[in-house]
Amino acid sequence: MSLITIKGAKASLIAAALSLLPAAANAAETLKADDYVGISFWLISMALVAATAFFFIETTRVQGKWKTSLTVSGLVTLIAAVHYFYMRDVWIATGETPTVYRYIDWLITVPLLMIEFYLILRAMTAVSGGIFWRVMIGTKVMLVGGYAGEVGYNGEWGGFIIG
């Protein structure tokens, strides 16, 4: 497959993803001008969409050893954008903090960030796979412990200490 074909395919994927944005951006109810939490969800969502486009476009401009980490960055920001659009809708509909959805987002994106960290580290120097697994297991323990503490499964302090 030629480089031009790959660039065209990436551009088509980005265009297709961005064409879905109006549907994701359409809240069931309208944000009120003084709803700063809802507005912050909206701003974060849009920033994440812009970051996604940036990371995917930049994969065509960097050396090969950086392409995978930029692609993972784009995936992280895309997944987070979708979750933040959804969290905004939950906030507007209920007026409550969407804690469970925030942790679902983190359970997906934080491990991806650890993968990205490992990829960047590996691009710079020789590292063992053991580092990757220690960081990944620590990440999962931190997230599950934090969630358990936040929702009261093991008390706030128990979750704080574990997380």
Q: Locations of the language-model features?
A:
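Membrane-interfacial loop-to-transmembrane alpha-helix junctions, especially the N-terminal start
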Residues: 8-13, 63-74, 126-135
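Internal transmembrane alpha-helix with an interfacial aromatic "cap," most often the third helix
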Residues: 53-56, 87-88, 94, 103-134, ...
